[in-house]
Amino acid sequence: MNLTGKKVILHDMSLRDGMHARQHQISLKEMVDVATGLDAAGVPLIEVTHGDGLGGASLNYGFPAHTDEEYLSAVIPKMKQAKVSALLLPGIGTGDHLRMAHDLGVNTIRVATHCTEADVSGQHISLSRELGLDTVGFLMMAHMVSPDKLLEQAKLMESYGANCIYCTDSAGYMLPGDVTSHIERLRGELKSDTQIGFHGHHNMGMSIANSLAAIQAGAERIDGSVAGLGAGAGNTPLEVFVAVLERMQVSHGINLYDIMDVAEDLVTPMMDQPIRIDRDALTLGYAGVYSSFLLFAQRAEKKHGIPARDILLELGRRGTVGGQEDMIDDTAMNMARERA
């Protein structure tokens, strides 16, 4: 693989996807400390919201330590070069949430849907573009569809006004060949000025290999998370990925030592538990289950006595997707009854 001379935009997820690993309890001080560290290290884009995006605070997804408005208001004024993004899932986040983010200075809105449901994103993508925001269509659980189907959905988002489309491996299920086929299909058929992005999870240990495959296939934006802080076994560990890109002579604009220090000195100490590929996280990737289901399944194990990996395998068999968190406890309860 020769990526010499390629240029990528790296996007940190530690303060949004990392919310899942922290049960949405990141403090304002932690948020600001990490964000300013990332900014100083040269990270160009930093995502800040509830783990499930703007408006995600709920009984179903979890109540955060602070509101999205409080987090964004604390971080954005401190940024010297980095831009701040926010995730929005139609049905959770609203137009009012989007306007609030714009008014606070958010640069990028990423409108996320399941990989077959791009048609629900039209209003939010259109509004984001009307407000002059960098607007991303974020197609989750991309492993569940063929490259042709992903392209069909991507074209819908592009038609609504998205200037960047993401292939999102929410389960950490994809292998490099899968990433290549999906990204190549997008790059070959979308408008030449529509950027392509890739978001990986490390549940099968493939996030760096998959991200490299994405770059080779034409992706220009790559998500990562400092120290891997994110749902499941975490996202592509950003400091490790930067080191790999350095060796492969890919331009990224981040200071390696500085990003290593943010990971070691700021992010790792605030973890509730080590971000690693344990048996439950591995099961997420193996079964193709949404990564943020991990802690829900572990809580269901304690409540019903069914091993989390058994619950996750059953959820994978049923084809559950993000937004069906309420099914996790029901599934565990039914499995417990059947085994009684």
Curated annotation (Swiss-Prot):
* Keywords from the named record: Aromatic hydrocarbons catabolism, Lyase, Manganese, Metal-binding
The UniProt annotation places substrate binding at: 16-17, 170, 199, 290
Name the chemical reaction catalysed here. Answer: (S)-4-hydroxy-2-oxopentanoate = acetaldehyde + pyruvate
Q: Does the keyword Metal-binding apply?
A: yes
Binding sites annotated in the UniProt record for Mn(2+): 17, 199, 201
| Entry's Gene Ontology molecular function annotations | 2-isopropylmalate synthase activity; 4-hydroxy-2-oxovalerate aldolase activity; manganese ion binding
A Pfam match: DmpG_comm
Domain of life from the UniProt record? Bacteria
Q: The Pyruvate carboxyltransferase domain covers which part of the protein?
A: 8-260
First-tier enzyme category under EC: lyase
Q: Where is this site: Transition state stabilizer?
A: 16
Family listed: Belongs to the 4-hydroxy-2-oxovalerate aldolase family.
Q: HAMAP family, from UniProt? A: HOA
Task: Tell me which PANTHER family the record gives.
Answer: 2-ISOPROPYLMALATE SYNTHASE 1, CHLOROPLASTIC-RELATED, HOMOCITRATE SYNTHASE-RELATED
User: What is the recorded name of this protein?
Assistant: 4-hydroxy-2-oxovalerate aldolase
Native organism: Shewanella pealeana (strain ATCC 700345 / ANG-SQ1)
Q: What is the lineage of its organism?
A: Bacteria, Pseudomonadati, Pseudomonadota, Gammaproteobacteria, Alteromonadales
